[in-house]
Amino acid sequence: MLRNLFRRRLFSCPTKYYFMLLVLSLITFSVLRIHQKPEFFSVRHLELAGDDPYSNVNCTKILQGDPEEIQKVKLEILTVQFKKRPRRTPHDYINMTRDCASFIRTRKYIVEPLTKEEVGFPIAYSIVVHHKIEMLDRLLRAIYMPQNFYCIHVDRKAEESFLAAVQGIASCFDNVFVASQLESVVYASWSRVKADLNCMKDLYRMNANWKYLINLCGMDFPIKTNLEIVRKLKCSTGENNLETEKMPPNKEERWKKRYTVVDGKLTNTGIVKAPPPLKTPLFSGSAYFVVTREYVGYVLENENIQKLMEWAQDTYSPDEFLWATIQRIPEVPGSFPSSNKYDLSDMNAIARFVKWQYFEGHVSNGAPYPPCSGVHVRSVCVFGAGDLSWMLRQHHLFANKFDMDVDPFAIQCLDEHLRHKALENLEH
């Protein structure tokens, strides 16, 4: 009798309620465990700060423009220890990418979308490279998102091990691939345009969902997170964004005479070319663009654009006038009117931040940007750590040039900063 009474009290209404609540809690916990993200996707694991065991640079101070820390970096680069630091080779990447799960985990690629906003606005990338596999890995990791699409064009002259390493990296991702047709790229020749066109075709045919195409080279690096890029592109409201200005007289020789490749170099034949086959005047610009999917479709399919491209194939640096000119043709989706009032300089366009040596100086005295903290190659600044503080205040999406051999700390600090910025809101 006492036992029965005990049972009735044990399973009275309040006790049953708590028991059922406990069971429901256990079921809910089990479901959440099944559907939670993989352990390696934790925010802390994806942070890049402290990732380089050979670096004792304070990136926070670097990004603040601290003169002492910047000078420390410059001195570090001169040391024997720095010059002998371990470097990853193409063969290292070939070996690492044999185990894709390990490669993705150890290299800390982001393999799940961070926000719904980014998922709803996929971006396509054309990346033209020929060497420096470590730099490509850093660039791809910095811009990689699972909802985006990435075409990598490898110069046919590149070493076989480099191509194999790129193919190895691409094989680890469903949305990264090597271009179906590879060109032997010659500086300032049509082959540079053709490399981007090949990726354009592949990207256009493989997926209909991406909104914009951004072209890059192996020495570019983002200065915005993917979410910031998405929001910038949304604000463009279907317009393309690239440098396009009135053609200066000193560049007319580039397209008024015929050029041909001789012994691997572009040579002026002295032969006068016929005028371009279009009513719109030629405009000056750069190789870099941010264009809509509709623009890409028009470029690939329009008969008049095809005629213009055929005409441009024996000119000097056609990439520096072709995209800029197409952007001013009235029928092109997302284009600008041809009036000079609509000219867009490299500093006003968002496609790329580049420092030219002959424009550098004191901003307070009217220069567009301060002096280069790194070195110059063909009058272009290869950025150093001292360039980051000013650069990150600009509106551009990417900057050029960065080089692991010149200043890896500039890339390291920028990489860490962008990754932390992308992840900092996920824990809240």
From Swiss-Prot:
Inactivated by thiol-reactive agents. Inhibited by free UDP. Glycans are attached at residues 58, 95. Pfam families: Branch. Residues 33-428 are lumenal. A glycoprotein binds at residues 243, 250-251, 254, 320, 341, 358. GO terms for cellular component: extracellular space; Golgi cisterna; Golgi membrane; trans-Golgi network. Its EC number is 2.4.1.102. Residues 122-428 are annotated as: Catalytic. GO terms for biological process: cell adhesion molecule production; core 2 O-glycan biosynthetic process; glycoprotein biosynthetic process; kidney morphogenesis; leukocyte tethering or rolling; positive regulation of leukocyte tethering or rolling; response to insulin; tissue morphogenesis. N-glycosylated. Disulfide bonds join 59-413, 100-172, 151-199, 372-381. Keywords: Disulfide bond, Glycoprotein, Glycosyltransferase, Golgi apparatus, Membrane, Nucleotide-binding, Signal-anchor, Transferase, Transmembrane, Transmembrane helix. The active site is at 320 (nucleophile). Disruption phenotype: Deficient mice show normal organogenesis and fertility. The loss of core 2 O-glycans on leukocytes is associated with leukocytosis and impaired neutrophil recruitment at the inflammatory site, while lymphocyte homing to peripheral lymphoid organs is not affected. Residues 5-9 are annotated as: Mediates interaction with GOLPH3 and is necessary and sufficient for localization to the Golgi. Changing residue 378 to A: Loss of catalytic activity. Reduces the affinity for UDP-GlcNAc. InterPro entries: Glyco_trans_14. UDP-N-acetyl-alpha-D-glucosamine binds at residues 128-130, 155-157, 187, 378, 401. It comes from the Eukaryota. Expressed in kidney, liver, stomach, spleen, lung and brain. Belongs to the glycosyltransferase 14 family. Interacts with GOLPH3; may control GCNT1 retention in the Golgi. This is Beta-1,3-galactosyl-O-glycosyl-glycoprotein beta-1,6-N-acetylglucosaminyltransferase.
